[in-house]
Amino acid sequence: MSRREKMIAKIKDLMYKPDSIRNIGICAHIDHGKTTLSDNLLAGAGMISEELAGDQRFLDFDEQEQARGITIDAANVSMVHNYKDEEYLINLIDTPGHVDFGGDVTRAMRAVDGAVVVVCAVEGIMPQTETVLRQALKENVKPVLFINKVDRLINELKLEPEELQKRFINIYMEANKLIKNMAPEDKKEEWAVDFTDGSVAFGSAYHNWAINVPMMQETGVNFKDIIDYCNDDKQKELAQKVPLSEVLLGMVVEHLPSPKVSQEYRVPNIWEGDIESPAGQGMITTSPDGPLAVMVTNVSVDKHAGEIATGRVYGGSIEKGTEVYLVGSHSKSRVQQVGVYFGPERVNTDAVPAGNIVYVAGAKGAIAGETICSPEDKIKEFEGLDHISEPVVTVAVEAKNTKDLPKLIEVLRQVAKEDPTIKVEINEETGEHLVSGMGELHLEVISYRIKDKGVEIQTSEPIVVYRETVSQLSPQVEGKSPNKHNRFYITVEPLEDELFKALQEGKLKEGKVKGKESANDFMEYGLDKEEARKVWDVYNRSVFINATRGIQYLDEVKELLIEGFESALNDGPLAKEIAMGLKFKLHDAKLHEDAVHRGPAQVLPAIRNAIYASMMSAGPTLLEPMQKVFINTPQDYMGPCTREIQNRRGQIVDMGQEGDMATIESKVPVAEMFGFAGDIRSAAEGRCLWSTEMSGFERLPREMQNQIVKEIRQRKGLSPEPYGPEHYVG
């Protein structure tokens, strides 16, 4: 039996022992060393050769990732680790740290129970560290901390033992501050990381060594020894005494929960069904014999096997050859293969039980976020995956050769399945399709993926996505149906800030409001009692309130009114961009007694026109997407860097100093960020580190609004000037 076969046999055996499984993610800011760390963990587990680890970028098996040297997708791998004479199955997901790929982090966090947060000792905790930690804690994922690149503190910054310890304590206190702010209430204390119990380790992923307090006690290696090893260029010897994989995987086994422990508190948080039901109990006890429950976190397309869905089995076992039911798409399909990952390759098994990360071939039509169960035991679906950022940059994509048109549409649908954070609009009439993503790099990689699937394309210059809103209360507006027999009286005003923020952060759910149980939630975030009890629908961070009393037949047209409200918000009156942050009230309605005269063809135009007219008479405003930009640069380059930000309509939010490095935090409109990478590099002569993260939408300066509205409308083939309210209700 070869070593590989032995390893696979162990994996197949351990996956039936949920106490011995750890599902973990590795997450960090870009370039803090996640993939190098993952490679060396694999080498320690005997999966790749130690010489190649670190340079091999084993988990970056996409050509784009190897070429750019960054992780774009979240990659999966399973390995076996021996800790205190017990064997454990560790399922590892390496996630991207670049802000444009934050969607992969969100999806990976749904599949895991624990996270190793990697922080660079030189740079400390950076904005993206905070974002990935927030995503982990939001999904109830427990963190441990690894401080990486310690050799650089010693060899480049020449720090003494006391200074080293001080640097570590700063990072660890900062990490705990974030954990205490963002962890679930009952876990704030329990999940704080601690040097003494070994839930914090430090080392060098590149040089393959790591140490924590328990390991120091066991081996007798102390801070001074570490400095000597680094100074004498003997890190290879150090790696033999305190190997990275021993320390890190030991920390994972000791401090991160098994599925058996974590599913008890995670399932109620991500599944809306009845916990007392057989499915609920099966998930909470991680039973391989309970009703099947799988949450799909990722879908990729394989040249030979077709669509491959990766996900987490929460309950029951998924078996090869059985029929399964996809809850979201209401469809059945037959499972052709199931199995687990072993590096980039997939290992087929007959079944994969609860508590494991699984791949499934044959779940046709599944997308990330789908719930798979058995057709006999249908269950409620898992909660949707909330991505922290939303697509803000769009490119138009066309096929270079007309013969590729049908293939391009197929490929775009595939790409949208593989990466749910992008938005694809397919227009079969014009052949111009729009792809929206999180930023320039995200769209470049998507264009590359389309070409990789065999379609040559042309892309337009990137276009920024705007939003529409209003700045004041409108007068009451009357919307008439084409037959003049139905009338609706509507006002609009800006939504309360507190409520808008709660919707943006996902504290309140969007969708039709059932019954009055949500009234308290709306009141908590600023609606008065009367309004809170009468909310009909929440959509695009806007609410639709029925403020009428005793109108005959209103219930019969309620669904149509909601449909009209939602479709009007999808393309606002100002520039056909999505509208958000609005509070609409229906004050009165006059309806024809005969149902024939109040069908969709009458009600939909009436309500849409009333909504458009009310918005156009309430100070219509464009909102533009903003990015936070963080820059680390030597003091001497602070001036040129701040000028670069200010030349792009940016505002400086905060400036700080750490040693001889300056830190600048700023906010810049996305529209001004194109080409920033090259410009900031030349401003600081290459001596700066920078990163961005989404910062929501803000009002466009009034003096720019007319020009930008005109440009958007012309691009969309509309008349250059938006229509006034009288056009809609005249």
From Swiss-Prot:
Is Lipid biosynthesis given among the entry's keywords? no
- Note the InterPro entries from the entry: EFG_II, EFG_III/V, EFG_V-like, EFTu-like_2, G_TR_CS, P-loop_NTPase, Ribosomal_Su5_D2-typ_SF, Ribsml_uS5_D2-typ_fold_subgr
What are the entry keywords? Cytoplasm, Elongation factor, GTP-binding, Nucleotide-binding, Protein biosynthesis
Q: Name one GO molecular function term.
A: GTPase activity
Carrying Diphthamide, the residues are: 597
Q: Which SUPFAM superfamilies match?
A: EF-G C-terminal domain-like (SSF54980), P-loop containing nucleoside triphosphate hydrolases (SSF52540), Ribosomal protein S5 domain 2-like (SSF54211), Translation proteins (SSF50447)
Coiled-coil annotated spans: none
Which positions bind GTP? Answer: 28-35, 94-98, 148-151
Instruction: Give me the Gene Ontology terms describing cellular component.
Output: cytosol; ribonucleoprotein complex
What's the chief localization of this chain?
Answer: cytoplasm
Xref: Pfam families = EFG_C, EFG_III, EFG_IV, GTP_EFTU, GTP_EFTU_D2
Where in or outside the cell it occurs: the entry states:
Cytoplasm
Query: Family assignment?
Result: Belongs to the TRAFAC class translation factor GTPase superfamily. Classic translation factor GTPase family. EF-G/EF-2 subfamily.
Q: What does this protein do?
A: Catalyzes the GTP-dependent ribosomal translocation step during translation elongation. During this step, the ribosome changes from the pre-translocational (PRE) to the post-translocational (POST) state as the newly formed A-site-bound peptidyl-tRNA and P-site-bound deacylated tRNA move to the P and E sites, respectively. Catalyzes the coordinated movement of the two tRNA molecules, the mRNA and conformational changes in the ribosome.
- Protein name according to UniProt: Elongation factor 2
**Organism expressing this protein natively:** Methanobrevibacter smithii (strain ATCC 35061 / DSM 861 / OCM 144 / PS)
Q: Which gene encodes it?
A: fusA
